[in-house]
């Protein structure tokens, strides 16, 4: 956790910009299909009220994953503070085989100890499946809760948790001198801060694989330009500002390259920059429009959108040469793909019969599953563990963010109150 805290510390510099209403997760459907689990309010060992509801954070994280259905607090058969106090039979009677208990203790130096135990109610009393403790300052209490959630989630599912991740997105506010803002928040909408404000549109944020930088599109020079901004100090590097269109940046998984789309020669085509040398090479060529690159895990192949066949479809190409290969065949058009970190599937915007939804395609079998049921869905971005997708959709006269699990069972919204929200991008593990 110490290493993760050092990485996340860079974000603290920007917290002074937290001036706006934050997005919050509103669950629409799918909780009941998750695995039942007990999450007990963490026992507070200090005076007055606890400074943070750590148990509530853990319960919300597990619920938001779509894989768990935490028992409502009003139905908890007991509220133990330690593994030894858990009565297995009381929980087993409710169909619950795992319970999270914990403690929060203030220290004389102003810090806090946060401890949790994951208890197996199917074993002997006090059987602990996982446990840990963290010493943190007050501003890191939510982070400690997310850390406990990650460990519990991984122990019970075998999948690395992604609750300490963040999302970047663009908000078009309701007026003001700088109506366009690039913001970053925790994955659940908390701890939001502004990375950049502009009087001109901002588009397409993309995370570097170490989570320290964001690439995005700005129009502040009078035309589109690609820039990379370092989050810790705000430093901005201009990557491309060619005539016509510069857009759709995507960092390679190994962090050495940036793919993007340019139309400096007419049609949109894909280019890749070596970030160390600044050298740019063209990947696609021809009269078709090729855009929206996303990397495969090998950092050598791209999936991208092309109208080579007339309507937009997703293709694959090696950055070192070779003809593009079409990989989407279902639906009237498919675009804006995001390939999973293991390369086994991708999510994309799929249109068919006048509907535009987020779909998942198995890259081995070609099988497609429609995940979303919202309106005019756009710009899907996968969580680093591949269990959830964040995307934007139209609601009323504006745009909002939505979450859907990659099995399609869990759906939630992240409504904002101060503008339209677009171009979500899920961070890597932090």
Curated annotation (Swiss-Prot):
GO terms for cellular component: periplasmic space. Disulfide bonds: none annotated. Its main location: periplasm. The keyword Cell division applies. It holds the Pfam family PD40. Residues 1-21 form the signal peptide. It is found in: Periplasm. Gene3D superfamilies: TolB, C-terminal domain, TolB, N-terminal domain. One of its GO terms (biological process) is cell division. SUPFAM superfamilies: TolB, N-terminal domain, Tricorn protease N-terminal domain. It comes from the Bacteria. The keyword Cell division applies. Keywords: Cell cycle, Cell division, Periplasm, Signal. The Tol-Pal system is composed of five core proteins: the inner membrane proteins TolA, TolQ and TolR, the periplasmic protein TolB and the outer membrane protein Pal. They form a network linking the inner and outer membranes and the peptidoglycan layer. Belongs to the TolB family. Part of the Tol-Pal system, which plays a role in outer membrane invagination during cell division and is important for maintaining outer membrane integrity. TolB occupies a key intermediary position in the Tol-Pal system because it communicates directly with both membrane-embedded components, Pal in the outer membrane and TolA in the inner membrane. This is Tol-Pal system protein TolB.
């Amino acid at each position: 956790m110490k290493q993760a805290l050092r990485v996340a510390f860079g974000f603290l510099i920007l917290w002074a910009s937290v001036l706006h209403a934050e997005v919050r997760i509103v669950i629409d459907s799918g909780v009941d299909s998750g695995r039942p689990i007990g999450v007990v309010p963490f026992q507070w060992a200090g005076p007055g009220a606890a400074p943070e509801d750590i148990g509530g954070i853990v319960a919300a994280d597990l619920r938001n994953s779509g894989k768990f259905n935490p028992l409502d607090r009003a139905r908890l058969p007991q509220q133990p503070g330690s593994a030894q106090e858990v009565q297995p039979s009381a929980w087993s009677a409710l169909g619950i085989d795992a319970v999270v208990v914990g403690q929060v203790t203030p220290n004389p130096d102003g810090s806090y100890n946060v401890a949790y135990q994951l208890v197996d109610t199917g074993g002997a009393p006090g059987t602990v499946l996982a446990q840990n403790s963290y010493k943190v300052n007050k501003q890191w209490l939510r982070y400690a809760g997310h850390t406990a959630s990650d460990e519990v989630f991984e122990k019970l599912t075998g999948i690395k948790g992604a609750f300490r991740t963040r999302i970047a997105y663009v908000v078009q506010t309701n007026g003001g001198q700088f109506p366009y803002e690039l913001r970053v928040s925790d994955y659940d909408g908390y701890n939001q801060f502004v990375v950049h404000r502009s009087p001109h549109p901002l588009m397409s944020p993309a995370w570097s694989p170490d989570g320290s930088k964001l690439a995005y599109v700005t129009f502040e020079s009078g035309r589109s330009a690609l820039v990379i901004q370092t989050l810790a100090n705000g430093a901005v590097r201009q990557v491309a500002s060619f005539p016509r269109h510069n857009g759709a940046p995507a960092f390679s998984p190994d962090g050495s390259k940036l793919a993007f789309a340019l139309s400096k020669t007419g049609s949109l085509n894909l280019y890749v920059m070596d970030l160390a040398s600044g050298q740019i090479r063209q990947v696609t060529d021809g009269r078709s429009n090729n855009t929206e690159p996303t990397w495969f895990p090998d950092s050598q192949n791209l999936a991208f959108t092309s109208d080579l066949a007339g309507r937009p479809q997703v293709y694959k190409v090696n950055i070192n040469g070779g003809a593009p290969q079409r990989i989407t065949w279902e639906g009237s058009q498919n675009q804006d793909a995001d390939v999973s970190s293991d390369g086994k599937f991708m999510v994309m915007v799929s249109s068919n019969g006048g509907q535009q939804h987020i779909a998942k395609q198995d890259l081995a079998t070609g099988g497609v599953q429609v995940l979303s049921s919202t309106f005019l869905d756009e710009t899907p971005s996968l969580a680093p563990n591949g269990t959830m997708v964040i995307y934007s959709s139209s609601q009323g006269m504006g745009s909002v963010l939505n979450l859907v699990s990659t099995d399609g069972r869990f759906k939630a919204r992240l409504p904002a109150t101060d503008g339209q929200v677009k171009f979500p991008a899920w961070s890597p593990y932090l």
